[in-house]
């Protein structure tokens, strides 16, 4: 898990943004790329470079592989409505993301771990698939045996993140009701995520 967190911070540094809005992210104090020539700063990106960087930000923020993000985009593209909103709605509906957004864990990586270890239920039933799609009205809850885990307690006590409006969180019960599928403009991203550039990247 430590290795995953270190890779996460390297991603923030490489992209030049504090992706998760955490105070301990090194990009907050060293806003330049890592490596021998990192202090020279970030290069000006081409149009494609900006699209690729936006794609990388989404992939890192949601802890997904390129294949997973591509497949999610294709489903969003084939649905009616705005493709960017469809994409963000699908990403925010992932079970691990709901657990993270509700503030029950400090990172989306630990949310994936919590789900995989069968510590999370949806409507009272254990679900151990991080990519499981939560539907409006579903109740996601941390199982009692996991409510005292240090990472859960630390995340709940932290004030670093704001719970989005599409979730109704009961901190005492360690539960969150998924009220609706959010649009891009409704998600309180700590960084500028530029979903329009992601759509352009996949559409090019």
Curated annotation (Swiss-Prot):
The keyword Ribonucleoprotein applies. Gene3D superfamilies: Ribosomal Protein S4 Delta 41, Chain A, domain 1 (1.10.1050.10), RNA-binding S4 domain (3.10.290.10). InterPro entries: Ribosomal_uS4 (IPR022801), Ribosomal_uS4_bac-type (IPR005709), Ribosomal_uS4_CS (IPR018079), Ribosomal_uS4_N (IPR001912), S4_RNA-bd (IPR002942), S4_RNA-bd_sf (IPR036986). One of its GO terms (cellular component) is small ribosomal subunit. The keyword Ribosomal protein applies. Keywords: Ribonucleoprotein, Ribosomal protein, RNA-binding, rRNA-binding. Residues 93-156 form the S4 RNA-binding domain. Part of the 30S ribosomal subunit. Contacts protein S5. The interaction surface between S4 and S5 is involved in control of translational fidelity. One of the primary rRNA binding proteins, it binds directly to 16S rRNA where it nucleates assembly of the body of the 30S subunit. PANTHER family: 30S 40S RIBOSOMAL PROTEIN, SMALL RIBOSOMAL SUBUNIT PROTEIN US4M. This is Small ribosomal subunit protein uS4. It comes from Anaplasma marginale (strain St. Maries). The lineage of its organism: Bacteria, Pseudomonadati, Pseudomonadota, Alphaproteobacteria, Rickettsiales. The gene is rpsD.
